[in-house]
Structures are given as C-alpha cells and as structure tokens.
Amino acid sequence: MARTDNDTWDLASSVGATATMVAAARAVATRAPRPVIDDPFAAPLVQAVGVDFFTRLATGELTTEELDTNDAESPVGMSRFADAMAARTRFFDDFFAEAMRAGPPPIRQGVILASGLDARAYRLSWPQDMVLFEIDQPEVLTFKAATLADLGVRPSTKLATVAVDLRNDWPAALAEAGFDASAPTAWIAEGLLGYLPPDAQDRLLDTIGELSAPGSRLAVESVPTHHEADQEELREKMKESSDRWRSHGFDVDFSELVFLGERADVTDYLRDRGWTVDATPTNQLLTRYGLAPLDSDEGFAEVVYVSATR
C-alpha cells in the first residue's frame, strides 16, 4: 500500500516491516563467521514480531544463499543487504562510542530517531550517567520494551522512550521526557531519511540543529537525490527485489514505501548550517569493516554515511 500523509504501521506492515527486515539482517550478520556486529537481541525480536519470512531468515532456517539463487539481476541480493546493514549498524555503534569519549563538555544524552527494533540501549556499554532517548510510534516502542522484558533483559543505561510520530511535535515530547537542549547531544538517524519526503528531511535536520547545544554530534545515513527521469526505473528495480523473494513469503513492496525525488545533499546542508561534517561512502565503510564493496549499480552503493559536530 502506498504511503499517505498520516499513515501508521506496526512492525509487520508498511515502514514498520522494514525495521523488522533490518533486524533480521542484523541477526544474519551476527551469525557470520567473522561478524562485524554482535546483536543477540535481533533474532528474538524478529521472532516475536511473528512474520514467517523474517523469522526464518533471522533464525537461519531460510539462508541468504537460497534467497539469492538466480538473483544476479537484482539491485541487491540478501547476502549483500545483510553486509550493508552490518556495516551501517557498526557505523552508528562506533559513532556513539566516539561521541561518549568526546568533550569537554562530555556528551551524556543521546537520541535515536525512529528507533524501530534498535537495541543499542540494551547491547552497548554506556557511561554511568548517560541517558538515551528513543523516539518512535507508540506501538513499536511498547512492543520492543515488552519483548525484551519477557526475555529478562534490562537496559544498560537510563532509557527514556518517547512515543511520538516524527510528523508530530516530537521536540515537545522529547522535552517532556527530560531532554536538556542546553547540554550536548549525540543524535542518530539510521535508515530514516529515505522514508521522509525531501522537505520533511530538511525540517528534521533544522530541528535537530535548533536542539543541539555546542559540542553536539549527529550521525545520519544520507540517501541520494533521484531525478524524475530515474525514479520509475529505480522503483521498478526495487519492486523486482521484492518480487524475487515473494515465493519465500516476503510481502513488502519497497517501491511503495520510500520517497524519491530531488532532495538536499545532507553533507552540504549541514555544513551550510554550521556543522563540521565528515562523509563516508558505503563502499569505504564496507572496506573499513572487512566486507566486499558493492558494485556501482547495486542497491545502497550510493548511500553516504555522515557524521557531524556542532
């Protein structure tokens, strides 16, 4: 189903299903012979969502080799998708670790925008006086907290969940949860911008800037602009990937979930607004973590990972 202005979702449908798919990819990456990441909560969270395709992928019952058979024409196979998600996850893990070592003044509050099934509040080590804010739709946050509690898992830091849609007044909800705009903050927007219209991307970055005291840091995954002439071809490629996995029970059409079109280059946008910016292309990130680079025409090859300091 195509996106609408006020659409909602759970972790088994629409944009929420992509969060579950990414968690399944993290489970695949965690089982790798030489894992780049270690996310012990990815598989149980996916299993709790209860979508058969994702469950079988997360537990290893369905292998990436099975999904990638005869998949040479696909924009990206499942094994490369898992590699890309492993590198992406590690980038944001490393960002938080580096941010916690920054200062003075030290950064002791972090914000995860559209956190989905992100379990960093549970699986990473944090300073004793750290507070982490997770923002997402109420149903997503409630499900994740309840599932991890049932597993007997407790957060490794002070965790404040902020149940609000990013299309609503999330800064007010964040402040009500205890966020201190006068203190430096580490922000991450992982796997988010492609699901925002271009103008909403700009508003989000502007709002983050307004809430960021000196010394704050931001990490974001920047998606490329897509000119009108290229949009139909890209949507068709995304649909082909979805269709190839459909015989295994996959029921998500990526082409209906993302917003294409021309959008601001995040690196330039932040730099023009006073941030000091560093940009890392996907293939450079893959190489850094010992993973094979993507071909130029594979999905995610054009994504750039941006870290910025206020």
From Swiss-Prot:
Keywords: Methyltransferase, S-adenosyl-L-methionine, Transferase. Transmembrane segments: none annotated. S-adenosyl-L-methionine binds at residues 136, 165-166. Its EC number is 2.1.1.-. GO terms for molecular function: methyltransferase activity. GO terms for biological process: methylation. It holds the Pfam family LCM. Exhibits S-adenosyl-L-methionine-dependent methyltransferase activity. Belongs to the UPF0677 family. This is Putative S-adenosyl-L-methionine-dependent methyltransferase Mvan_1346. It comes from Mycolicibacterium vanbaalenii (strain DSM 7251 / JCM 13017 / BCRC 16820 / KCTC 9966 / NRRL B-24157 / PYR-1).
